[in-house]
Amino acid sequence: FQTYTPFVDLSIDRAGEEVAVQVTAVMRLSHAALPAMITRGEGAIINVSSMLSFSGSLNHPFMPKRSVYAATKAFVTTFSELLAAELQGTGVRVQALCPAVVRTEFHDIDGKPVLRPNVPVMEPADVVKASLAGLRQGDTICIPALEERDRLSAVADANRALFDAGRGAELASRYR
């Protein structure tokens, strides 16, 4: 499900359908599966997110057409990270799988095939292989094409620093 349409041109009902599929369904399915996994003391949830979950600060020509889709994927990534933290010690693992473009019919649905020469496309079997390897390695976020794992660690470190710096009780001087 995707709505690659500028938000102002997107039917609010269609946007709501995307949120229902990409956000509400992820929560409901996770909530339904977790009790049995916790009781067994083992299990794994793999939530399919996207590299677009990291795109909020990008200034790229195609980004304005993906606000709802990218926001739902940002939810999936953050939800998965925080759920994994909540479940530490239970034997249940959670992973946000964040591929870029994968060779599926996904992009053909709206009549805009993505298979152009300048777009790197990963094979579905490779995405699955990366996800399962990431689970074995304990990765909460799996980015199949990311060679340098330190880049993901740098993002986490930057997020922690921003979170800590932004928790003051007084306005920053630029807002006074």
Language-model segment annotations:
Residues 50:
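Residue(s) in the substrate-gating loop at a strand-loop-helix junction
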Residues 99-109:
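Short, flexible catalytic-loop segment of classical short-chain dehydrogenase/reductase
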Residues 6-7, 14-17:
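Substrate-binding pocket helix/loop in short-chain dehydrogenase/reductase
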Residues 30-31, 81:
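A short, exposed helix-loop element centered on a Lys and neighboring polar residues
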Residues 62-75, 79:
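The catalytic Tyr-X3-Lys active-site helix of short-chain dehydrogenase/reductase
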Residues 96, 112-151:
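C-terminal helical subdomain
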Residues 55, 61, 81-93:
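Active-site-adjacent segment of SDR/Rossmann-fold oxidoreductases
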